[in-house]
Swiss-Prot record:
<dbReference type="GO" id="GO:0003735">
    <property type="term" value="F:structural constituent of ribosome"/>
</dbReference>
<dbReference type="GO" id="GO:0006412">
    <property type="term" value="P:translation"/>
</dbReference>
<dbReference type="Pfam" id="PF00886">
    <property type="entry name" value="Ribosomal_S16"/>
</dbReference>
<dbReference type="InterPro" id="IPR020592">
    <property type="entry name" value="Ribosomal_bS16_CS"/>
</dbReference>
<keyword id="KW-0689">Ribosomal protein</keyword>
<dbReference type="InterPro" id="IPR023803">
    <property type="entry name" value="Ribosomal_bS16_dom_sf"/>
</dbReference>
<dbReference type="GO" id="GO:0015935">
    <property type="term" value="C:small ribosomal subunit"/>
</dbReference>
<comment type="similarity">
    <text>Belongs to the bacterial ribosomal protein bS16 family.</text>
</comment>
<dbReference type="InterPro" id="IPR000307">
    <property type="entry name" value="Ribosomal_bS16"/>
</dbReference>
<dbReference type="GO" id="GO:0005737">
    <property type="term" value="C:cytoplasm"/>
</dbReference>
<protein>
    <recommendedName>
        <fullName>Small ribosomal subunit protein bS16</fullName>
    </recommendedName>
</protein>
<keyword id="KW-0687">Ribonucleoprotein</keyword>
Amino acid sequence: MAVKIRLARGGAKKRPFYRVVIANATAPRDGDFLEKVGTYNPMLASDNSERVVLKKDRIEYWLSTGAKPTERVAKFIEKAGVTLPKNVKKEMEVKAKNRKVRPSKKESKES
C-alpha cells in the first residue's frame, strides 16, 4: 500500500482549512485517512505560529516507513526542521528543475 503525507481540505467556501494527513495514495483527497499529523490554515498571517502545526515525531515515523509527502507538505516539513529522506529531496529538486516558468501577461504583451 503506497502511503502519502498530504493535505485534506476542510472549512467553508472561500475559507479554506487543511489537515495534514497520512492517507492511502489511491484514497480521495478528503476521504479516509490513516492518521492526522497536523493542520495548515492559509488564512492566518505567514508569520503566525498557528499557521502550520505539525506532529514532528509522527511525521518522522511515517517518513521512516516509506510515506512520501506531496510538494507542499514537504516544504512544511522542512521548515519545521524535520529532515526529509534523500529520495524525496531529489524528487523535489527534479520537479523544481523541470518546472516551466511562463511569462506574465505584461511580459507577453511587450514582446
